[in-house]
Amino acid sequence: HDQLIGMKGYGEGALKMKGALSNLDIDGEVYLDSAYLVSVPYGISMRFANDPVRITDSKLLFENFMMYANNESPLNIQGSLDFTNIEKMMLDIRMRAQNFLLIDAKENARSEAFGKAYVNFYGAMRGPVSNLKMQGKLDVLGNTDMTYVLKESELTTDTQLDELVKFTNFKSGKPVVVERPALEGLNMMLGMSIDESAHILCALNADQTNYIDLMGGGDLTMTYNSVDGIGITGKYTLNNGKMKYSLPVIPLKTFDIQDGSYIEFNGDPFNPTLNITATENVRTTVNEGQGTGRSVDFICGVKLSQTLNKPGIQFIVSSPNDATLQDELNTMSIEERGKIAITMLASGMYL
């Protein structure tokens, strides 16, 4: 499966050729039937419309040519492939698609990403086939629902509680590594807008019991070249969502992600910077001595910072409606507040 891109299917038609073999002039028409553009390493299969394609003066003409991925909304292509010089074939096409189902992947044991991704796309690709330049705009639509599994994620705290917070995958068996050849000769720049209704679930372990369920949006820029590979920059702001999180001493909790949390991409698409605060409300009795106590509402949770590969986790607690207790919490160090937060999350008590 070294081949990056190939074609399968049937085509029939008539061609007229004249001139020297080194400089053929070709005219004619080809009818495609059940023809596909496929990339085995990347799991892509796109069906060509069963339409005639004209060849004029050694130019393959795309005239409102349609390609289909996973639904009946086509990618529309206009332009030409000029093979007057076989050694230097030139492509010049414009592409557009609306509500295009770009990804439709079911979960399996090797899945890193699965679900459905719907997009609008406008773009152009130009240049010699060996050195193409692509620019465009990709809008990820609100009906998108994707899951991304971080199988190797190991989250640790930046307080003194390191040993409490480790995720380990105990499943045996060596993972299967899929070798994907690099895309040679392509320079790409895509503006990406993610609709605020798009739903992306980021699983923090292989069995998906710990996860961050993201609702949000943002504007990102995605670049690709064969030297640097793929890069993403921009900010994905969270306006909603849940985080499910368990620790050796804390039962599985569901926290609410606070508005204004965000994920910022600085190049590496697999290692963004995190700024996520996720909390839950806890009501508990605070002992005032002599066996008396009063009921207090606390906001308790976790704050994720630093990068996805090496995140910092801080446990947080506050009592916004009780000034006396809040003053008491303010005098403590981050570590002391963290221990109070962990105790509260584990036992429901303020100690």
Regions found by a protein language model. Give the residues of each.
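Strand-loop-strand
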Residues: 5-14, 28, 32-351
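Acidic, carboxylate-rich catalytic segments that either coordinate divalent cations
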Residues: 24
